[in-house]
Design a protein with these regions (language model features):
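Short His-Asn-centered micro-motif
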Residues: 58-60
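N-terminal leader/targeting segments and the immediate start of mature chains
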Residues: 1-26, 164-171
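Positively charged, polar, low-complexity stretches
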Residues: 16, 35-42, 65
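A short, Trp-centered hydrophobic/proline-enriched beta-strand micro-motif
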Residues: 19-36, 71-75
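C-terminal edge-of-domain segments
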Residues: 2-5, 120-171
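Short active-site oxyanion
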Residues: 51-55
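Short, structured beta-strand-loop surface elements
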Residues: 64-128
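A short, well-structured catalytic beta-strand-centered motif of the EAL phosphodiesterase domain
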Residues: 44-47
Length: 171
């Protein structure tokens, strides 16, 4: 079927998303609900392999995203060859055990009071749906770019619309 991928392709692209995000965990995140500020801002993802379809962010309680609500996050990999648009819900989840689990030196640099900093908020982004693109232009596609020509879809990479970013789904 044109424009649709086999399940194995979707599984591969979801796995690639989490690998690329672990390598470069920076996303643009913004609230999308009515009356919300419509601009996204950069946040550093804290990934927990035990949480499916969830990304955590440390932010100040005074951060405009800290109020939570419907949100979108955009991701571009370090090599600019993988892209993700994630839709979901952002909410504060100040679970001390999760803060301990995700805490690191980079986060500590932003919060002088450490894990008990009064301005510290752990934001939980629960992903409801995602659209993922991986650009892996084939050799023939690269030659067409260099010398002119039309790149066919099969030469340009992978694309998937998914309801879960879990790396595998039960049969």
């Amino acid at each position: 079927m044109a424009g649709q991928q086999a399940p194995t392709d979707k599984e591969a692209i979801k796995t690639t998303m989490w690998e690329r995000m672990a390598d470069s965990p920076y996303l643009m995140v913004g609230l999308t609900g009515a009356g919300q500020h419509q601009h996204s801002e950069p946040l550093t993802a804290q990934l927990d392999k035990d949480q499916v379809d969830t990304i955590f962010f440390f932010a100040g309680k005074d951060n405009r995203a800290a109020g939570g609500g419907e949100a979108m996050a955009q991701f571009v990999s370090k090599g600019h060859d993988f892209f993700a648009c994630l839709a979901g819900t952002l909410a504060q989840d100040n679970d001390p055990a999760m803060i301990d689990k995700l805490w690191n030196k980079q986060v500590e640099a932003w919060f002088p009071g450490g894990k008990s900093d009064p301005n510290l908020a752990l934001l939980r982004f629960d992903i409801d749906s995602a659209e993922l693109w991986e650009t892996d232009i084939s050799l023939s596609g690269r030659l067409k770019m260099l010398f002119g020509g039309t790149i066919k879809a099969a030469e340009s990479g992978s694309h998937a619309k998914v309801q879960t970013t879990a790396e595998s789904t039960p049969a």
